[in-house]
Amino acid sequence: MPPKAAEKKPSTGGKAPAGGKAPAEKKEAGKKTAAAASGDKKKRGKTRKETYSSYIYKVLKQVHPDTGISTRAMSILNSFVNDIFERVATEASKLAAYNKKSTISSREIQTSVRLILPGELAKHAVSEGTKAVTKYSSSAK
């Protein structure tokens, strides 16, 4: 027996009833879906991962032009460079804080390299760094 006009209709489980406002709701939903679909179709660019691979490769070719390097070895060297960079930056930051300065200068970098790297390696790193800063300063003028 169909329900009378005065009686309440049983819930349809969240679904829209067959008559009334359903077509209008579908049109609105259709518009939203179309907008969302066009947003979904937009391709996301690959997130770029910054590495030192190209620079490591260039140095390798300067030193040993006929030698190659595996992906795993490149990954290890990249991790090594990141680790040393982080250690030097952290130490330079501490040195600047000790001296109540808000700027890290070449002096802090040089001191942190001397503290982090052992003996002869530190001497070579400092001399190469000084040479690089001098070259940069002369080319900037």
Swiss-Prot record:
Processing and modification events after translation: Monoubiquitinated by the ubc2-bre1 complex to form H2BK123ub1. H2BK123ub1 gives a specific tag for epigenetic transcriptional activation and is also prerequisite for H3K4me and H3K79me formation. H2BK123ub1 also modulates the formation of double-strand breaks during meiosis and is a prerequisite for DNA-damage checkpoint activation. Acetylated by gcn5 to form H2BK11ac and H2BK16ac. H2BK16ac can also be formed by esa1. Acetylation of N-terminal lysines and particularly formation of H2BK11acK16ac has a positive effect on transcription.
Composition bias type Low complexity, residue spans: 11-22
Region (Disordered): 1-49
UniProt KW keywords: Acetylation, Chromosome, DNA-binding, Isopeptide bond, Nucleosome core, Nucleus, Ubl conjugation
UniProt cross-references to PROSITE patterns, sorted A to Z: HISTONE_H2B (PS00357)
Bias-annotated ranges (Basic and acidic residues): 1-10
Crosslink position(s): Glycyl lysine isopeptide (Lys-Gly) (interchain with G-Cter in ubiquitin): K135
Molecular function via GO: DNA binding; protein heterodimerization activity; structural constituent of chromatin
Residues joined by cross-link Glycyl lysine isopeptide (Lys-Gly) (interchain with G-Cter in SUMO): K8, K9, K26, K27
Pfam families recorded: Histone
Residues the record lists as N6-acetyllysine modifications: K8, K9, K15, K26
Chain's role: Core component of nucleosome. Nucleosomes wrap and compact DNA into chromatin, limiting DNA accessibility to the cellular machineries which require DNA as a template. Histones thereby play a central role in transcription regulation, DNA repair, DNA replication and chromosomal stability. DNA accessibility is regulated via a complex set of post-translational modifications of histones, also called histone code, and nucleosome remodeling.
Family to which the UniProt record says this protein belongs: Belongs to the histone H2B family.
Annotated protein name in UniProt: Histone H2B
Organism: Aspergillus niger (strain ATCC MYA-4892 / CBS 513.88 / FGSC A1513)
Source organism phylogeny: Eukaryota, Fungi, Dikarya, Ascomycota, Pezizomycotina
